[in-house]
Amino acid sequence: MITILFAVPSLWAEYESALPEALDEAGIDATLVTEADPADVDYIVYAPASPLQDFTPYTRAKAVLNLWAGVERIVGNQTLTQPLTRMVDPGLTEGMVEWVVGHTLRHHLGMDRHIVNPGHVWDPTCPPLARER
């Protein structure tokens, strides 16, 4: 049987019922635990908030499954020798696209003239159209 260590206690309540259901739907026979002997762990579900930072004892682990799309907080961890996967989800992608578009428009439209305006003075300057930039 596969043993999956959910190594993010602060997020367990959010995943406690959803992960077993998803494993069942995928036909994966696995035991999902929040504590385990490192020698028994096949996969680690991880997020940067996890107290688990030393992966050295997890010699049997086949992969670390990161709940976040970003991996910048873990890639420098010298104890991580297992393959690292990151979350890929349409909602994460959509949210990141919206965030990038929003900040790009903020920059190109010069919105900080209005947002960061301690004198509360109206600036009637029209930004150029995109094709004119």
Indicate where each model-derived feature is located.
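Phosphate-coordination loops involved in phosphoryl transfer and adenosine-cofactor binding
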Residues: 1, 81, 131-133
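N-terminal glycine-/charge-rich "phosphate-binding" loop or analogous flexible N-terminal tail
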Residues: 1-42
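A generic alpha-helix propensity feature with a strong bias for hydrophobic helices
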Residues: 12, 60, 127-131
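A short alpha-helix capping/helix-coil boundary motif
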Residues: 32, 79-81, 126-127
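Phosphate/diphosphate ligand-binding glycine-rich loop within oxidoreductases
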Residues: 42-118
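Glycine-rich NAD(P)-binding loop of Rossmann-like domains
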Residues: 113-133
